[in-house]
């Protein structure tokens, strides 16, 4: 079991219930899923890029990514409807907690010139989105075996009703937000 999950169950849930004075334990915000998305715009010209990106994301997440396809044609981007333009993975339960544990304790501290996560990246419903500029901050990916630096989007979906509740949940789980 991941350290973050144990910490949530043993400390954070009680702390949040006290802070927001919830009457029912089911009202306490919790993380439901983490979605990792990697947009690969160059995949229209080189099909190998998708395979390499899928390998990277599979090493990060522990499960096989799904290819996302263009919904409509856009001439300016030289994209046709149905062409592969990205990949994504949705993590739940144990894999989600393992990924969050590695993200907070290993990957984020390895970011160059890191000054904290942007506290304004909540969506109004307690969900948090962040971008990772370089996938090499994760120790699972070996620097020598990467064909190119790619970024990815990490979206953390919670049951929180407001941004304040979501921020309190993630802060209690040691997410380093800017002050």
Curated annotation (Swiss-Prot):
Disulfide bond entries: none
The keyword Ribosomal protein appears for this protein: yes
Residue ranges crossing the lipid bilayer per the database entry: none
Organism superkingdom: Bacteria
An individual GO BP term: translation
Keywords, sorted A to Z: Ribonucleoprotein, Ribosomal protein, RNA-binding, rRNA-binding, tRNA-binding
Entry keyword RNA-binding: yes
A GO-annotated cellular component: ribonucleoprotein complex
Any one Gene Ontology molecular-function term assigned to this protein's record: tRNA binding
Family, similarity comment: Belongs to the universal ribosomal protein uL5 family.
HAMAP family, per database record: Ribosomal_uL5_B
Subunit text: Part of the 50S ribosomal subunit; part of the 5S rRNA/L5/L18/L25 subcomplex. Contacts the 5S rRNA and the P site tRNA. Forms a bridge to the 30S subunit in the 70S ribosome.
Function: This is one of the proteins that bind and probably mediate the attachment of the 5S RNA into the large ribosomal subunit, where it forms part of the central protuberance. In the 70S ribosome it contacts protein S13 of the 30S subunit (bridge B1b), connecting the 2 subunits; this bridge is implicated in subunit movement. Contacts the P site tRNA; the 5S rRNA and some of its associated proteins might help stabilize positioning of ribosome-bound tRNAs.
Name this protein carries in UniProt: Large ribosomal subunit protein uL5
Annotated source species: Chromohalobacter salexigens (strain ATCC BAA-138 / DSM 3043 / CIP 106854 / NCIMB 13768 / 1H11)
């Amino acid at each position: 079991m991941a350290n973050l999950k144990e910490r949530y169950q043993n400390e954070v849930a009680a702390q949040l219930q006290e802070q927001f004075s919830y009457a029912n334990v089911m009202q306490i915000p919790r993380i439901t899923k983490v979605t990792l998305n990697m947009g690969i715009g160059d995949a229209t010209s080189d099909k190998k890029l998708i395979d390499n990106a899928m390998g990277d994301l599979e090493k990060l997440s522990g499960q096989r990514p799904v290819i996302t396809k263009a919904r409509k044609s856009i001439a300016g981007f030289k994209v046709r409807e149905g062409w592969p333009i990205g990949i994504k993975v949705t993590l739940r339960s144990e894999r989600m907690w393992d990924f969050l544990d590695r993200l907070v304790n290993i990957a984020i501290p390895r970011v160059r010139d890191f000054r904290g996560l942007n506290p304004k990246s909540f969506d109004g419903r307690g969900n948090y989105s962040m971008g990772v500029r370089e996938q090499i901050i994760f120790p699972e990916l070996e620097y020598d075996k990467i064909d190119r630096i790619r970024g990815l989007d990490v979206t953390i979906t919670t049951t929180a009703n407001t941004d304040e509740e979501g921020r309190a949940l993630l802060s209690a789980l040691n997410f380093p937000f800017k002050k």
